[in-house]
């Protein structure tokens, strides 16, 4: 696929790195020569120094034959205009990054009137991910499928967990949890395992399971990870993510306090979020945190602009309270180190944004067999969990799973059919109209038939 990416900032770079691995022809555009050079020197892409709004620049980038243009500059207006000019200059689909809360309220209008294929708001997307883990604090990450009806829950095994040393073959009999399916195991931040019956759980493994919510709650109780729903939250930092998160939490009835050092920003937040408590102060001030009873907080989100501050704040919160903690990290260079720290749920906004866009790119390859409906990457892309909507002519339909020759390191995690969640056995079949969750490790797929051996 021919893809043009306008903007070589954090999100742009993450997109280029992820999409180039999937063998797309990519052209990047940015007005900053050093940003273009940094990408073209490390990734096999073509770079153009110029203004992405310019018709001449877009023509030079090959807009007439492009399949997709993604505008992720720092300016919402530039992104919108870039997409409009791209639509007029060629026949490509367009994606625009829009961050301003005012534009976000008019997203449907903008998408329709400007003919945009997709609008992505990184801060809102990150806030939604954080809100999900506050709703289910036993998990460190919650991914949703089938339009929110199926959940993939990730949790960390503690040193004293009953799972330690347990073989997967004895998992259901020991814990009496037949409706729980173990999908993937991330170990030492170095590998992601699609487990078989001989697999043995160990402390510090990150386990992902598919389950109905009530079954998951019962399972977490059995392994000692049961936590009550968060009732109050302290948010360090008053940026866009904090704004969207507070709005979501307040709508869910969760008391929310935001600590922000900038007076002008505090005034804005007070006007926009009248039900929240807004404090003007330094979130790293231990006395201020103590005054706000951080020791008794049910939830704590470190969302300042500095990774170092966020990491220290979450470590401090975990040390003095039992709060559900969430840590925002912008840089992704040291994920293997950061993931080993006791930071609760770690949110990488640019990675989340890239995942949403990659899902859309894969869905553009919709085939006779299936559509890609959702996609989540695990451990820096070492594994993926995808949702496919099966079509009538799919090569995998109406065949018992035990009779399908499924590739190594591939697992059919769940089938969603007629409002029912099916944890599949060998006798089950996939059928047209099903939403099917697939976990894979070691390769990328964009069509359900690719789970089969050649």
Residue spans for each PLM region:
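Cytosolic regulatory regions of ion transport systems
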Residues: 1-454
């Amino acid at each position: 696929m021919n893809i043009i990416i306008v903007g070589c900032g954090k999100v742009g770079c993450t997109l280029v790195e992820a999409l180039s691995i999937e063998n797309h022809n990519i052209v990047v555009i940015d007005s900053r020569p050093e940003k273009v050079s940094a990408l073209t020197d490390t990734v096999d892409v073509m770079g153009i120094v110029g203004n992405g709004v310019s018709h001449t620049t877009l023509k030079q980038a090959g807009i007439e034959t492009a399949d997709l243009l993604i505008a992720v500059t720092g300016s919402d207006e530039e992104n919108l205009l870039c997409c409009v000019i791209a639509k007029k200059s060629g026949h490509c689909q367009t994606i625009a990054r829009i961050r301003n809360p005012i534009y976000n309220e008019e997203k449907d209008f903008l998408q329709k009137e400007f003919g945009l294929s997709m609008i992505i708001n990184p801060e809102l997307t990150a806030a939604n991910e954080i809100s999900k883990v506050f709703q289910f604090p036993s998990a460190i990450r919650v991914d949703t499928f089938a339009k929110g009806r199926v959940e993939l829950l990730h949790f960390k095994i503690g040193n004293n967990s009953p799972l330690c040393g347990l073989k997967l073959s004895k998992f259901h009999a020991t814990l009496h949890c037949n409706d729980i399916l173990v999908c993937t195991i991330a170990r030492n931040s170095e590998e992601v395992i699609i487990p078989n019956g001989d697999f043995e759980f160990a402390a510090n493994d990150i386990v992902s399971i598919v389950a109905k919510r009530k079954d998951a709650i019962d399972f977490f109780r059995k392994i000692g990870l049961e936590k009550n729903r968060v009732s109050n939250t302290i948010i360090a930092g008053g940026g866009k993510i904090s704004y969207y998160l507070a709005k979501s939490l307040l709508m869910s009835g969760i008391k929310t306090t935001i600590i922000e050092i900038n007076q002008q920003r505090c005034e804005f937040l007070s006007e926009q979020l009248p039900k929240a408590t807004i404090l003007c102060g330094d979130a790293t001030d231990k006395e201020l945190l103590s005054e706000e009873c951080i020791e008794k907080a049910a939830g704590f989100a470190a969302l300042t602009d500095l990774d170092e501050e966020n990491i220290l704040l979450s470590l401090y919160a975990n040390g003095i309270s039992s709060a559900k903690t969430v840590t925002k990290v912008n840089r992704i260079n040291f994920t293997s180190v950061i993931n080993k720290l006791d930071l609760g749920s770690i949110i990488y906004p640019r990675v989340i944004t890239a995942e949403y866009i990659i899902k859309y790119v894969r869905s553009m390859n919709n085939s006779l067999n299936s559509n890609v409906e959702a996609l989540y990457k695990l451990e820096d892309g070492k594994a993926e969990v995808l949702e496919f909507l099966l079509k009538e002519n799919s090569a995998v339909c109406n065949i018992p799973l035990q009779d399908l020759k499924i590739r190594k390191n591939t697992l059919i995690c769940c089938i969603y059919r007629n409002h029912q969640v099916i944890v599949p056995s060998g006798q089950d079949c996939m059928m047209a109209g099903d939403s099917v969750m697939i976990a894979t490790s070691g390769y990328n797929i964009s069509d359900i038939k690719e789970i089969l051996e050649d």
